[in-house]
Amino acid sequence: TITKLVQELVEENIVTDNGKVETPGGRRPNIYGLANSAIYFVGVNVGRDFMGYVVTDLQNNIILEQMDPTFELLDRPQCLDRICTNIEEFVSSCGVDRGKILGLGVCMTGRVNPTTGRSYKYFTSSEESMREIIEERVGIRTLFENDTRARCYAEYSCGKAKDENDMLYLHLG
């Protein structure tokens, strides 16, 4: 039955029981929701002279955040390999079960094509897109975006501008 399946999901900490709802008549229904610990997301910021990493839960709570100030973005195969290795190491050491990570978002400096997952400046000689290479190496569904666009969207959806109808985002740097 549905009740039994939902109870199993509650016991596995995938779903939370948020209590009953008042109704004008009849049996009061229970409200269920996804548990914060059911799904996680990894974000990676590839800058010119750093890499930043973050793991968040369903409520955008930051579980872990790290910065690598020793990274230098160069248009060489070794650099793409280092990006993949750094992401693999972060995912392996972040303390979250890999099976609970729903997606990996990678934002990168410079012009990028989020649809194809390619940078117009870096790693252009590869037949596979940067997104495809990272996704294959790390084993997690990967989205690829320009860093300014990603920051703007984050500010609009869950930052200081989340309650605004209109906004202008300037990235100076």
Task: Tell where the protein language model's regions lie, with residue ranges.
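Conserved phosphate-binding catalytic cores of ATP/NTP-utilizing and phosphoryl-transfer enzymes
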Residues: D17-I39, F144-M167
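Gly/Thr-rich phosphate-binding beta-strand-loop-beta motif of the actin/hexokinase/Hsp70
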Residues: R28-E65, L168-G173
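N-terminal helix-turn-helix
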Residues: T1-D17
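Glycine-rich phosphate-binding loop and adjoining helix at the ATP-binding site
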Residues: T70-D166
